[in-house]
Curated annotation (Swiss-Prot):
It comes from Orientia tsutsugamushi (strain Ikeda). InterPro entries: Ribosomal_bL27 (IPR001684). Keywords: Ribonucleoprotein, Ribosomal protein. The keyword Chaperone does not apply. One of its GO terms (cellular component) is ribonucleoprotein complex. Pfam families: Ribosomal_L27. This is Large ribosomal subunit protein bL27. GO terms for biological process: translation. GO terms for molecular function: structural constituent of ribosome. Belongs to the bacterial ribosomal protein bL27 family. Residues 1-26 are annotated as: Disordered.
Length: 89
């Protein structure tokens, strides 16, 4: 039996697309209600005032205003949206 088995295809050669995680808005930037500020896996950033936390840990704005990053206890980085009189319509 000098037959040869059919050549199989490689088990490598595929990759998943990137998930587009990270900051979408930076500190001091103006946002509207509903704008996504950060897409993340887990809570690298924590929600502060006037922001919501989605079930996939996305932080989004609840009001229009300016994005503010700050640190609190345990070196946690919090994100808030500060409502300015100039940004309120």
């Amino acid at each position: 039996m000098a037959t040869k088995k059919a050549g199989g295809s490689s088990k490598n050669g595929r990759d998943s697309a990137g998930r587009r995680l990270g900051l979408k808005k930076s500190d001091g930037q103006l946002v509207n209600a509903g704008n996504i500020i950060v897409k993340q896996r887990g809570t690298k950033f924590y929600p502060g005032k006037n922001v919501g936390l989605g079930k996939d840990h996305t932080i989004f704005s609840l009001v229009s205003g300016k994005v503010k990053f700050f640190r609190k206890k345990k070196n946690r980085v919090f994100i808030s949206v500060v409502v300015d009189d100039s940004t309120a319509a």
